[in-house]
Each structure stands twice: as C-alpha cells, then as structure tokens.
C-alpha cells in the first residue's frame, strides 16, 4: 500500500501529535556496533541527542519521547503553532537564524571541527523580519514536523559522511533509508501507548532489562532527573516545570498535564530549553515511570501471548483496559501505519485533503 502524503496526515498550522521514525540505509548499523565490520558508531547516538536539544530549544514543536537505536531512531513530536504565534518577529528571525545560519563559526568537538551558528547582526535579522512573505513562511516552518526531521537527518548524515572522510555525494553516500515514517496520534490512549512503545525500544530489543538500564532514550533522562532530585534532597512536590535548566530532561516536554489546575493557553517555555511547559498526558511522572516499569518487566518475564499481571491502578482512573493497551504497545509498529488510536478515533478520522478513511492493519 502506498504511503500517504504528509499533507494528508498533518499540517503545520494545527496542533498534532506525531510518531516519526527514520532508518539508516540498507539496514546498516550506522548508529551503533556493526558486528560485520567491527566498527562502533555508538557516539552518533549522542550526536542525535545533542541535535534534538538544539531543535527543541528553537522549534515550535514539543519533544515528548525519543529512542536512539543502532540502525534507526524514534521520536514523538507535537507541533505547536499556538506557541509560535506568541513569538514576535525578532524572536522568529533569531530562532530561524540559529537553526539555519548563513554564517558559522568552527569549534572542535570530539576531535572533529564542527560548525556552529554565528551571532546574527541586525541587518541579518532585518532580512527576515522585514520581509512579510518570508516571515510568514518561516513561522509555518517552525511548527513543521517535516522541517524538524529534515534538519535532524541532514545534520547527522553530513557529519557521518565527514567522519568517514567523504562527501555526501560520494563514498558513504546516502545515510538514511528514504523518507521518514510518520503516524499521527489521534487520542490520549494512542499517545500514551506510542510514548511507551518508543521509550521501551531497548527493552523489546533485549538490550536493556529495566528502564533504568536503557540508554539514549527519553525515559532514561526522566529517570536520571528524578534520581538527581532525590540525591540533592529536592522536595518531592516540585513541579517538572520548575526543575533545573541543567536537568537531563530539561529539553523534553513535561509528562504531566493537569486539565483542572493548569493554566490555559500555549504556555511557552520559561527556561528556553524547550518549546513549551505543557505536558501531554494526565499522569504524574512517577505514574508514567511505573507503567513503563510494569511493561518492561512484563515483557521480560512473560511468554509470548501471555497477559501481564499486577497492572498499575492508574489504568482505572484513565479508563483504559491494561491488557488491550499492552497489546497496542506491543504491536504498535506493525498495527499503525498512518494514524493510531482506538477504534472510535480511527473510524471518525479522515485524510486532510481527500477526506478518505484511514487504513489500520489487523494484528
């Protein structure tokens, strides 16, 4: 079945949660240990994490979850045009210059010469903010998931080719396998399932036994942030929004959203490390980690097809069947190709342009 055009799934002008995934070319292990050649490219996962931090600080897009594996990576993103709407023209110009600078400075990182954005001059900022057409185009790009993926994949590919001593047009050549895959998340149930699916990638691949053991994932950073707070005797009542700007998860969207008490509106980030301070699920951080821990241990101890036991009580509050939801997480990658959600959400959803129903595989 042909893959849907991006315009049929989501639009930068609307708030949308999306799961995206990109694979390295020819199933090569270009982000980890390649057993065939003996080369280890694990350090490239750090490149991805560093770039994610830069993108999260400048795009109008929330980074909800991520996982870097040896031949692919997963992200859960939420476009926030409402946050972009709160930025004045100067802020829009500054952010775009930081993402796509016309001038760069060279710094040495891990033995490599890396280009970083130079500080823009007033003239360079004026070239953007004094052009209404260009400014409107850039505002749209800042909440566009496709532009996020374009800059991320391009950066990693060019840096990897430079490391190999070649140019993008020759030598190592293409780094990524075609287009990135995208699945729109239609409801809270699918959003929680997708975040868990992404965070538990190392556990399903038998690379890690528990969530604490995983590396290069958003859950690892959330656990590290909580452990740091405990070690520093920080109050348990502290909000994830008020954590240190140096916390390991400072560039990630907060987990918890309180629909009753949280203020309305976009809630742009106060730290400048991420797009906004708005959470994405009605769970406390500890409850989310409890669910992931339950799933990870169930995956490790249960036989194929068996039902996980001792489900966290939070499922009752969310009105989610833990057995059905656990199966959704387990089969997420195979079941959902364009959109994800419960039966009612998928049945009522239509493609944006042609107004057709979405296809969902039976697993």
Language model features: what each stretch is:
Residues 1-363:
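Short catalytic/metal-binding and nucleic-acid-binding patches
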């Amino acid at each position: 079945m042909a893959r849907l055009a991006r315009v049929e799934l989501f639009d930068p002008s609307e708030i949308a949660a999306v799961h995206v995934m990109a694979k390295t070319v020819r199933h090569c292990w270009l982000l980890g240990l390649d057993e065939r050649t003996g080369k280890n490219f694990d350090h490239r996962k750090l490149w991805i994490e560093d770039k994610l931090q830069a993108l999260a600080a400048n795009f109008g897009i929330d980074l909800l979850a991520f996982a870097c594996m040896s031949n692919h990576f997963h992200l859960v993103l939420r476009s926030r045009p409402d946050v972009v709407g709160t930025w004045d023209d100067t802020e829009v110009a500054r952010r775009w210059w930081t993402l796509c600078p016309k001038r760069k400075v060279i710094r040495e990182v891990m033995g490599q010469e890396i280009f970083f954005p130079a500080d823009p001059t007033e003239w360079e900022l004026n070239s953007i903010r004094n052009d209404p057409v260009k400014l409107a185009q850039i505002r749209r790009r800042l909440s566009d998931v496709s532009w996020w993926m374009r800059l991320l994949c391009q950066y990693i590919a060019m840096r990897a080719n430079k490391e190999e001593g070649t140019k993008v047009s020759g030598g190592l050549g293409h780094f990524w396998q075609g287009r990135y895959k995208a699945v729109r998340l239609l409801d809270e149930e699918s959003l929680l399932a997708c975040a868990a699916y992404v965070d538990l990638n190392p556990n399903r691949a038998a690379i890690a036994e528990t969530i604490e053991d995983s590396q290069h994932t958003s859950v690892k950073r959330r656990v590290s942030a909580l452990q740091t707070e405990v070690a520093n005797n920080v109050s348990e009542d502290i909000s994830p929004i008020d954590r240190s700007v140096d916390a390991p998860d400072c560039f990630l969207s907060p987990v918890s959203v309180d629909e009753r008490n949280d203020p309305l509106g976009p809630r742009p980030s106060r730290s400048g490390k991420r797009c906004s301070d708005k959470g994405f699920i009605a769970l406390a951080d500890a409850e989310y980690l409890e669910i992931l821990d339950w799933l990870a241990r169930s995956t490790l101890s249960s036989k194929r097809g068996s039902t996980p036991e001792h489900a966290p009580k939070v499922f009752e509050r969310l009105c989610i069947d833990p057995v059905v939801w656990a199966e959704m997480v387990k089969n997420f990658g195979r079941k959902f190709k364009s959109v994800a959600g419960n039966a009612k959400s998928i049945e009522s959803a239509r493609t944006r342009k042609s107004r057709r129903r979405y296809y969902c595989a039976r697993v």
